[in-house]
From Swiss-Prot:
Protein name per Swiss-Prot or TrEMBL: DNA topoisomerase 2
Record: residues binding Mg(2+) 2: 539, 541
Similarity comment: family membership: Belongs to the type II topoisomerase family.
Domain of life: Viruses
Gene3D superfamilies per record: 3.30.1360.40, 3.30.1490.30, 3.30.230.10, 3.40.50.670, Histidine kinase-like ATPase, C-terminal domain, Topoisomerase II, domain 5, Topoisomerase, domain 3
Binding-site residues, Mg(2+) 1: 438, 539
GO CC, any one term: host cell cytoplasm
Main location: host cell
Induction: Expressed in the early phase of the viral replicative cycle.
Cofactor descriptive note: Binds two Mg(2+) per subunit. The magnesium ions form salt bridges with both the protein and the DNA. Can also accept other divalent metal cations, such as Mn(2+) or Ca(2+).
PANTHER family given in the database record: DNA TOPOISOMERASE 2, DNA TOPOISOMERASE/GYRASE
Amino acid sequence: METFEISDFKEHAKKKSMWAGALNKVTISGLMGVFTEDEDLMALPIHRDHCPALLKIFDELIVNATDHERACHNKTKKVTYIKISFDKGVFSCENDGPGIPIVKHEQASLIAKRDVYVPEVASCYFLAGTNINKAKDCIKGGTNGVGLKLAMVHSQWAILTTADGAQKYVQHINQRLDNIEPPTITPSREMFTRIELMPVYQELGYAQPLSETEQADLSAWIYLRACQCAAYVGKGTTIYYNDKPCSTSSVMALAKMYTLVTAPNSTIYTTTIKADAKPYSLHPLQVAAVVSPKFKKFEHVSIINGVNCVKGEHVTFLKKAINEMVVKKFQQTVKDKNRKTTLRDSCSNIFVVIVGSIPGIEWTGQRKDELSIAENVFKTHYSIPSSFLTSMTRSIVDILLQSISKKDNHKQIDVDKYTRARNAGGKKAQDCMLLAAEGDSALSLLRAGLTLGKSNPSGPSFDFCGMISLGGVIMNACKKVTNITTDSGETIMVRNEQLTNNKVLQGIVQVLGLDFNCHYKTQEERAKLRYGCIVACVDQDLDGCGKILGLLLAYFHLFWPQLIVHGFVKRLLTPLIRVYEKGNTVPVEFYYEQEFDAWAKKQTSLANHTVKYYKGLAAHDTHEVKSMFKHFDKMVYTFTLDDSAKELFHIYFGGESELRKRELCTGVVPLTETQTQSIHSVRRIPCSLHLQVDTKAYKLDAIERQIPNFLDGMTRARRKILAGGLKCFASNNRERKVFQFGGYVADHMFYHHGDMSLNTSIIKAAQYYPGSSHLYPVFIGIGSFGSRHLGGKDAGSPRYISVQLASEFIKTMFPAEDSWLLPYVFEDGQRAEPEYYVPVLPLAIMEYGANPSEGWKYTTWARQLEDILALVRAYIDKNNPKHELLHYAIDHKITVLPLRPSNYNFKGHLKRFGQYYYSYGTYVVSEQRNMITITELPLRVPTVAYIESIKKSSNRMAFIEEIVDYSSSETIEILVKLKPNSLSRIIEEFKETEEQNSIENFLRLRNCLHSHLNFVKPKGGIIEFNSYYEILYAWLPYRRDLYQKRLMRERAVLKLRIIMETAIVRYINESADLNLSHYEDEKEAGRILSEHGFPPLNQSLITSPEFATIEELNQKALQGCYTYILSLQARELLIAAKTRRVEKIKKMQARLDKVEQLLQESPFPGASVWLEEIDAVEKAIIKGRNTQWKFH
């Protein structure tokens, strides 16, 4: 039983950090040095490595003294001095005024079985003192009645001396409270209390005795606390440190002391913050604020109730008030609505000192130095004088404007991955070009080309070519600048700190020798540059051309548009496609897909050609690099600046998302053959053309990667995963590791955005837990795929977890017959995934989702499956009693049938108020146990994130003692233990409203199911829906028309197959008369078959029509030959074989008759097929839900 050790309070306090803080040295943030001005200016720095428990020991005695001063403030016998000293490790704190009552404590004497006096109880007995039960108007800094005892328990020895005007009490306390000597009590008229002690330094991580450095460092900290206390108690009481009075008896003096060296001669703004109701109005707060550009972040010193308060709602209240004024003034000054100042910006140049008392506060944090009080106390009762805020705001705004000025134009940085041209910056600088490579692989290609040497003597080399890496990404400079109009009307463009510190862009500026103050309109100005031009060498994919190159152009257009006008910005246009004809080693090269498409249409066949795509520069081999660099000059194209470019740069890279959204609602207009020929003939590319084609294509592609299509509710990545899954698991649905399946998708579906993001998407597609995005998982996850606890972020590594296709569900939701009718994406000339699916049910409104993209927000809340089924069936079935009503609603764009949020896997409540639904968690209140048990959270709220949000809310944690989470992945059980007497106060403070009761408000057990129904359209661009009904109404015709297309295509295929099989049967019957074996070749045999009326057919197309359209079937199927007859083997001419063919024809004819019948169905062709497929999907969903989507 040795493991079940029993420890008393004293021993526990010696060993555990929970009482006074860490018991060893740690780095403590927020420790600031102070400065004192004697004859010479003297700085007292404070190092950050200290033992919190030791500082707590000293602080407890100081706070006890200031508490006593406040308690005696309005009494006859006041505290006139507090003497603090520290010498050779011995700390002492003394104050006059009434001493501790020297009377016996009956209860303690009875327990100890000896005479115990009140001073001993106050200093040696844990959980005893005057601060345990505090009144609401109490302004004491003490909290739990353990502070002085902690000082004793961490002291080698201590001497307590107190005099109450009649007697003097002296008591020695040794060995960390283990040896308490009897007190000496003598008559005395004095009135004071003094405590001296020697901490156990060695136990707390210090030398014992203290080293000189430690002694000086601790002395500086204690001096700081003495100065703080001097400001707190004011001029009526003198604070001494080592017998020297502290001169900081006001908040102004304290602020000056802190900033004497760091911000000398700064204006100090002071004010008094008053309250309008008792008890707060009895204790105004004194505030001093120092505003200086030398401060780089907001800092504050708060001495509240004598405690050095590290944070609290009073500071937040002041910061928000300052920020509100600064934002207003800043907007009036800069006159730029797109320029936003944050709370951090507004307060980063301020040092604030707050001194005073606040009644009824709680002290939290391990060292009990974090102020906690309901935030609405300040909003309701306290007010900050407007004159103070106004005068201070003017200074803050002036500093903000200065900080974003152009004084930092020539900041020098270390430029990574830069190779200088030998002639750069010299007499031949204008003949040099800087090659800006997209990344490391592009740098390797350039280096290979520039070092060809003798094999390419007339080609480019390092003599006139430098190289620099763009690092694979460029910052959007357009969003990092602010235009400020001065009083004189001049517009100044200022860069923010992020832009000036950006290594890539600043590296380009430094390497080229660019000056932000120069416009480069004249040749004389341009001649000062270190290079004659910059050549962008980027991949031919959307990321390279559309994003990186576009951002580089935008950067130059923003600061130096004249350089583009004079041809300074160029690009290396490398071949996108090479076509090798069989037997010919010289390829045909194409730089745009439109060129290749036009060429391909003119070819009779590409069977003898090999087509290779080069979207990445790294795809070119050594031979191809040599070939390119022999004609390097011909591959360098110059950008030109046309009239419409300025507006397009603003649209695609500026801060006005509404302009960009309007532009991106339409698709890209591809380059025409005439345009590509024009570009090649002059080797010039208008910026507007690049932006309208490449940049817009990238933006639209980014949207499709982040926002789903309304037809299938899928982003491009998820669509690739589904298409890859249907292909990969088609023949064998055995489980595969996530990373293996990810590799398959990347290879077969041409995924180009990294393994990590792909594997993450696969894992999400298999997640199924309460609150997950997908109510209908695409894959069955085998292993740990994440839980509700962390919102799925706790999934296992892709190397260890596996997936298999949820085939029973997927194959019913996405019928195989649809796959031949859908439009497909072509990557590198090969068919990849469909541009969109059209599932049997509207998946876009059946699952959850949220994502932003290019100014749009996408947020959906899954709708009730039963409502969706009812609506879709009513739309299809003309015998449904609600059929006509629904069609009337669709025609008139109204709603008649419910389409409620899904409550599947959710044990809470859904309620509607106005136009929005709200989800509510559930809870059980136990007044007897003073506890609330949360049994369900609002929809899609992860457990850990929820608990963290509660803990971050100080006004809620003021009532909470402990939060314990016993939740599983399926169920919620969160125990919220309240502090004593908190329940009634919670109900009083967190008011009940129509939408939520007090407990729901307090525990944040409600969220709004607000939707942003922005989806990608089938042909690209965004469509904005106003309701889930609109999505459903838009989706229905696409699914409906698919049945007619499917049936018409099936009819065409059946007819062709019947024609072919009938011809074969006829040939078998007439083969003896035709006797084709007597003819010498197939051509002659074909002539005979033609003369006898046998149709020439394209057997391969009829047998495997796959992606052929009806038009292609009708045109090409009857333009074949007679291989289907001439390839028949002898056994296929037997009577048994003929009989089987006749039966096959009958079955096909029967199916054709059925198809013809389905095409004549009402209200539309294939209506009954759709109903059957809906039944199959519903059955699969029910089975999936009943088996946790394992289907077994």
